[in-house]
Structure formats: structure tokens, C-alpha cells
A protein has these predicted regions:
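C-terminal motif of bacterial Sec signal peptides marking the signal peptidase cleavage site
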Residues: 15-19
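Positively charged n-region of N-terminal signal peptides that target proteins for export
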Residues: 1-11
Length: 501
């Protein structure tokens, strides 16, 4: 993206410089600086025709039908994001910061404080390599705007790296400002943070955040966020890479998952909790891998939703993520749902992989997996054409509940290596419009089993393992053309287009 002369003129007139912080010992760290950024670190252009505005979560469907008429985006659980101005389509030409580092520097036992509007406390630019040890960073502002510029480009983040390396060790970061992310890596920024406590209090204030291709590595953090659209682990337009090991990540606001993923994120040996939101949201061509983590979510009821979920993989076409396959992988650890169903995928291609996860279901346990179109009132795709194309692989996994699919979706369900499914597989055409040619193909290997709890419908069934009813009796397997493949002794029937055993 090229710099725009008009944008430069406008920004020169409106950007404010202010705040207080540690004075620099040399010009490498300028106090109360306004730093001009080149466009090299701007994210890739959004998909053609894809509008995009504000907050963690997208709104506008691919057919252009508007979502919220106020132009703001809202998270999937329907709790609207914060207010704030509409975002610009390219990175800002400059950032305000109290302590701006443009040359290599290491400092210890210092405090960096910011009180200015949309101002960072610490900013790393110009390829500098900066290390801060035993630090305190405080970002407080009553008039910061938040919104897209904070979500997409890091405006107003407490610690921001846009071009250079920032290493943070053994510190504390606190923010009380709209758009006050704890740590933000954007563009050519590369952040490494360890043994640090991060607390954010207002909206659009993620704990650790990447966008525009930024990179962030975190170890042994304690992160708490309290605002809306403030995921503890957050990413946004342009994505990036996050690698996280250990620590505790808690989000308390509505519309604030523990992890909001429009990037490639890997987390191991960490505790992840969303107290008023789904646990995980992944949009578009992005991935989340969890290993030996504890994960919990508690999505509130909301009239905009047609169901409640704990982990969602979807696509809104807002421009915040590239269209493509969303990937969720979880090995070991535990997953707890406090409300609604467990896994939901709609209006996207998606892939799930589960292995040895200890699952605690919500009291309602609405579904184990829902792979269907949607009637979400925000408009995720064209109604009747917004199904999912999903591959779900369970490896040495116990799982319970209903699996739902429809004729505008395609589901490949693979039970492998000793997996046990206790539940039913149902074709639910509620949100399928006039229908389509979607399929549900189930494969059960020789070591795996399906305990059937209700009459089920699939397109094809390959079973090298075992199928029994919850009543302990054999299950009838009947072709859609009336062919009797198996005459069971129990009350349950599986209807399938084809059967192989």
C-alpha cells in the first residue's frame, strides 16, 4: 500500500502528542514522540468486495447484506463490540508514543506511563532491537477512541512494535483506555515476552495481540481482560504468528473469547478461560493448535444467535481474515463448556482434530458438533447457502452428544484409534433453505466404536469397528432405498446411502 498525501495532511492536523513517562537517557528513546511509519508494515489487502469495520468479530455477509446498521461489528455471541470511529483501510502514517525506540537499547527497572489520547507508552520502530527488564508499563486515558485503528494497527496499545524486536521480561502492564491492548505486534514487529502480568480494563483491549503479519512469542504470562471485544489472546486483520507456552489467560467481558484467532496461533501448557463468551473463535484461513491446555467457555444467551456454542469456526467475509479453511487442533488437556453446544462451524471450510481431550459438557449439551448453515441475525453468508465444509477427526477420543448436519454442508467424520462416540447423527434442515447436495460421510476404524443414542441419518457409513445401541442391542442399518444392511434387535436405526463393513 502506498502512502497517501491527503492522509498525511489529515493526520498532521488531528494527531495529538502527550503523556508522561520516563525520560530517555539518549536519543534512541524519544519522550513524547510522534513516529512516522512507512507503509511496508501494512497488512495485505482484504478480499475483493469485503467490507470491514470494528471489533473482534465480523458482521457483513458475502452477498453484501448489511449486519448492524450502525456500521459496527459484533462478536459471534452477539454482544456488540465497543464504539469508536470507523477504521481506515491502511496503517496510520504515524503513532503517538511516550517512549519511542528507533535504535537498539536495553533498560531495566524503569516505568513507562502514557495518558495521551490514542497513545502508546512504548513503541519500537526502524528495525530497533529493544529489551526491557523488570519494567512497569501503565496506559491510562479517558478520551482514547479505540475502534478499528486499535484493532487492526495497534493504535493506543501499551507496548507496540511495528518494525523491530521488543523483548519484555519480568514486568507488569496495565491499561485503562479504549483500544488499550497490553502488547501489540504489527507488521514487521517481533515481540518476545515472558514472566509478565497483563491487565486490561476497557473495550477493544486484548491482552496480547498480533495483526498485519506481526509475530509474538509469550512464556509464562498472567493475562486478564475485562472489556468487550478484548480476547486475552487476540488477533485481527492481516493476521500473524503467535507462539505461547504456559501461563494463564482469562477474558471476562462479553464478546471476548479466551482466543480470537485470525492468525496462526500455537498454545501449549496454558490455562485459557472466557467467563462471558465462547472459549474460541476462529475465522477464515487461520489456525489454532492447543496442546495440554485447559480451555473453558461460557457464552451468554443472545437473541441474535440461532444456537449457542463453545468453539466456533466460521467466515463472515468482513475482510478481517482471508477466506479459506479454519483449523482447530487440541491434544491433551481439558475442554469445559458452561452453556450450549460444543463445536459449531458455519459458512466456511473447516477442520477439527481432537486427541485425548477431557471434555466436560454444559448442562444442556445442545450438540457435540453442528455443521450447518445459519440464521444468525448479523448475516454470516447468504441464507440457505451458508453451510460448512468440515472434516472432523477424533483420535483416541471419548465424545458425547448429537452431531448435526444439513444438505448445504459437507461433513466427513472420522473416528480413529479407539475413539468412542456416544450420540446420534441428525440431518437438521432448519437453516438449509431450499436444500442442496450436502453429505455426511462417517468412517469408523477397527479400534473405534459408535454407541447410538437415537435414530440417525448419514450419507455413507464405513464401519470396521463396532456399532451398538445405548440399549445394549444391535442397531438396524437401512439404506435410503430400503435395503436392509443390518437387521438390528434394538430400537435404533441408522439410515445411510451406502454401507461398508
Amino acid at each position: 500500500m502506498k502512502k497517501q498525501a491527503l492522509l498525511c495532511m489529515l493526520l498532521a492536523g488531528i494527531l495529538m502528542v502527550g503523556g508522561c513517562g520516563q525520560k530517555a537517557a539518549d536519543p534512541a528513546a524519544d519522550t513524547t514522540a510522534q513516529v512516522t511509519e512507512t507503509s511496508d508494515s501494512a497488512p495485505a489487502d482484504k478480499p475483493d468486495g469485503a467490507p470491514g469495520e470494528n471489533s473482534d468479530k465480523p458482521e457483513n455477509p458475502p452477498d453484501g447484506t448489511p449486519g448492524n446498521m450502525d456500521g459496527k461489528q459484533a462478536p459471534p455471541d452477539g454482544e456488540g463490540g465497543p464504539g469508536g470511529p470507523g477504521g481506515q483501510n491502511s496503517a496510520p502514517e504515524s503513532y503517538d508514543a511516550v517512549s519511542s525506540f528507533s535504535e537498539d537499547k536495553e533498560e531495566s527497572d524503569q516505568t513507562y506511563a502514557s495518558t495521551g489520547k490514542d497513545e502508546s507508552a512504548v513503541l519500537v520502530t526502524s528495525g530497533a532491537s529493544v529489551t526491557l527488564n523488570n519494567f512497569t508499563i501503565d496506559r491510562t486515558s479517558t478520551d482514547s477512541t479505540g475502534g478499528d485503528n486499535s484493532s487492526f494497527y495497534g493504535t493506543g496499545a501499551a507496548a507496540l512494535a511495528t518494525d523491530g524486536a521488543l523483548t519484555l521480561t519480568g514486568g507488569t502492564i496495565t491499561t485503562d483506555a479504549k483500544g488499550g491492548a497490553g502488547i501489540f505486534s504489527y507488521g514487521n514487529g517481533n515481540v518476545s515476552v515472558s514472566d509478565t502480568t497483563i491487565t486490561t480494563k476497557q473495550d477493544t483491549s486484548g491482552g496480547i495481540h498480533v495483526a498485519g503479519g506481526g509475530t509474538l512469542t509469550a512464556s509464562n504470562l498472567t493475562v486478564e481482560t475485562n472489556g468487550e471485544s478484548s480476547a486475552a489472546i487476540r488477533s485481527d486483520r492481516g493476521g500473524g504468528t503467535m507462539t505461547i507456552n504456559g501461563g494463564t489467560y482469562t477474558s471476562k467481558g462479553t464478546g471476548s473469547p479466551a482466543v480470537y484467532c485470525t492468525a496462526d496461533i500455537t498454545v501449549s501448557d496454558a490455562a485459557l478461560s472466557a467467563e462471558n463468551s465462547e472459549a474460541v473463535c476462529i475465522e477464515g484461513l487461520n489456525s489454532l493448535s492447543l496442546k495440554n491446555c485447559t480451555l473453558s467457555g461460557n457464552i451468554p444467551e443472545n437473541e441474535q444467535n440461532d444456537c449457542d456454542w463453545t468453539v466456533i469456526l466460521y467466515q463472515s467475509m468482513s475482510g478481517d481474515s482471508e477466506v479459506g479453511e479454519s483449523n482447530f487442533s487440541m491434544e491433551g488437556g481439558s475442554l469445559t463448556s458452561l452453556n450450549g453446544g460444543l463445536f459449531y462451524t458455519t459458512n466456511t471450510e473447516s477442520s477439527f482434530y481432537l486427541k485425548h481431550v477431557d471434555i466436560t459438557y454444559s448442562p444442556s449439551n445442545d450438540f457435540f458438533l453442528k455443521c450447518t448453515g445459519n440464521a444468525n441475525k448479523r448475516g454470516w453468508g447468504e441464507s440457505g447457502k451458508n453451510g460448512a465444509d468440515c472434516t472432523f477427526t477424533a483420535d483416541e477420543q471419548e465424545m458425547s452428544g448429537a452431531i448435526l448436519w444439513d444438505s448445504i454442508s459437507n461433513l466427513k467424520l472420522n473416528l480413529t484409534s479407539g475413539t468412542i462416540l456416544t450420540g446420534s447423527i441428525l440431518q437438521d434442515e432448519t437453516n438449509a433453505g431450499d436444500g442442496g447436495n450436502g453429505t455426511c460421510d462417517v468412517t469408523i476404524d477397527a479400534l473405534s466404536a459408535w454407541t447410538v443414542t437415537g435414530n440417525s441419518t448419514v450419507s455413507s457409513l464405513i464401519c470396521k469397528g463396532s456399532i451398538t445401541g445405548a440399549d445394549g442391542k444391535s442397531v438396524s442399518i437401512i439404506g435410503t432405498d430400503g435395503t436392509v444392511f443390518v437387521q438390528g434387535e434394538g430400537e435404533y436405526t441408522i439410515t445411510t446411502g451406502s454401507y461398508e463393513h
